[in-house]
C-alpha cells in the first residue's frame, strides 16, 4: 500500500492527498502530465482543469499551461468554464515577459443555433489581451484581472 503526500513550496508540513479536496486529486494528473517533457510536439486535451478547485487556483493552472507549452513541446486543447483561467491566459498574452503570444492562443466559443447544431465561433486575443467578438452575456469579468491585463499590456 502507498500514499501520496503533498506540501506547499513554502512549508515543511506534508498532507496526504486523500485529505485534500477532490479538486487536488483531479488536477494532480494534469500537473504531472504538463511537467513531462516531450521530444516532439504533443497535443494534450484537458477537460475542465479547474473543476473542484478554488478560483485562485485557476490562475495557477493557466500559468502552468503557459509555462509548459513551449518548454515541454506541448500544444493544449482546453475545455473550460472558468473565467479566471481565461482571464489569466489573456493576461499572459499581454505580458511581454512571457513567450506565449497572441499567435499561440485561439479561443472558440461553442453554442447551439436555433436547430440545436453546435456552432464554433473563433475569438482571437490580441497582443494587449483583448478578445474579439466575445458574447456579452458570457463571463462578467473580474475588475482586478482586467486591471492586470492593462498593466501587462503596457
PLM region descriptions:
Residues 1-151:
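Switch/communication elements of ASCE P-loop NTPase nucleotide-binding domains
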